[in-house]
Amino acid sequence: MNTKINSKIRESLNKELKRQQSHIELIASENYVSQAVLELNGSVLTNKYAEGYPGKRYYGGCEFIDEIESLGIQTAKELFHAEHANIQPHSGSQANDAAYKALLEPKDRVVAMGLDAGGHLTHGYPINFSGYTYDFRFYGVNKDTEQLDYQEIEQIVLEHKPKLIVAGASAYSRIIDFKKFKEIADKVGAYLMVDMAHIAGLVAAGVHPNPMEYADIVTTTTHKTLRGARGGLILCKQEFAKKVDSAVFPGSQGGPLENLIAGKTQALLEASTDEFKEYGKQIVKNTKALANVLQENGLRLVAGGSDNHLINVDIKSTLQITGKKAEKILESIGIICNKNMIPFDTEKPFYTSGIRLGTPAMTTRGFKEEEFKQVGLIIVSALKDQSEENLEKLAKQVVSLCEKFPIYQSIKY
């Protein structure tokens, strides 16, 4: 058996490692997992087929797999105060797919946040499986505040009388009132599902309200702010447990990825610590520090600021450049972010009027408020003065900041 990584793969791996070490990562959905999670992702568990659930497998030799998955299930339930947990979904999208299957029939009506307002593809976008399987109607944000308008959401729900309401977003920077969503759902007898993929780590840390208190089903990814192996997780009330499990296997998936389930379990255990609670608090502090610097230097923030881990910046109205161009400028100096639509955007999705910035990854590396103030000033300078001389100077500042907060020093491929 070959024991060496292919030379071309090794070369790319080492270049990617160097990129991660030397760049400031501000993509809101990215993070740096612990070396324990990395090790588990590449463990011998990848060899094992384990269709089914702990104690009810369709393959032999699963006793140790069962131990790990059972630990993950129990940890998820305790961490999020859930009656039931399924940690097998391969992704957040597949978690959402299974949640829909557990609650709905094809063509049932759903009300969710529109993609242009900050929602997600799996919340009914027409060319996504969700959009062509179910009958979605959408709510957005108030045009003046760019925040959720619960009175307007209630009117939309009363008009369309959905079977399911989806709360949650991929680009919304304010606290979501899950209690209010539950009250609205109850008025039409609808189920409430919350997609907390972006904020799960903040919920675990106690710095964002826990949707499990109000929702029938909660879905999430296990990476992003939760800082785990890539994958999905479903939490629900006990009355939906059987339907959820059946919707995942055999409804949506076959064999679970037990190496990633081990990585998820490790991350859930890490998220149960006091250290992680402090991490969650620091994410929010860092976001506010970055937001303040950007605002003080004339950049307009969508919704007026942030309560969580991300900031949506309206680049077009303040600097007359697209989000795509801003993304490329920042990447040229070693700051990685993504172009992003903003509410009521007039630009096409490939160009956008905004960029989305997130603090989780660099908070993992040890950045605090002072470092994020520096990052904010670098961003402003790069976008306002795109001269080669200035960008070269700023790129050196980025490298200097990264060198003060090293990551994965012991890894070499």
From Swiss-Prot:
UniProt keyword Nucleotide-binding, yes or no: no
What role is this protein assigned? Catalyzes the reversible interconversion of serine and glycine with tetrahydrofolate (THF) serving as the one-carbon carrier. This reaction serves as the major source of one-carbon groups required for the biosynthesis of purines, thymidylate, methionine, and other important biomolecules. Also exhibits THF-independent aldolase activity toward beta-hydroxyamino acids, producing glycine and aldehydes, via a retro-aldol mechanism.
- Cofactor(s), by name: pyridoxal 5'-phosphate
Q: Which residues carry this modification: N6-(pyridoxal phosphate)lysine?
A: K224
Listed PROSITE patterns: SHMT
* Entry EC no(s): 2.1.2.1
| Site feature (Plays an important role in substrate specificity) residues | H223
Source taxonomy lineage?
A: Bacteria, Bacillati, Mycoplasmatota, Mollicutes, Mycoplasmataceae
GN (gene name) = glyA
Write the protein's name: Serine hydroxymethyltransferase
Query: Where does the source fall among the domains of life?
Result: Bacteria
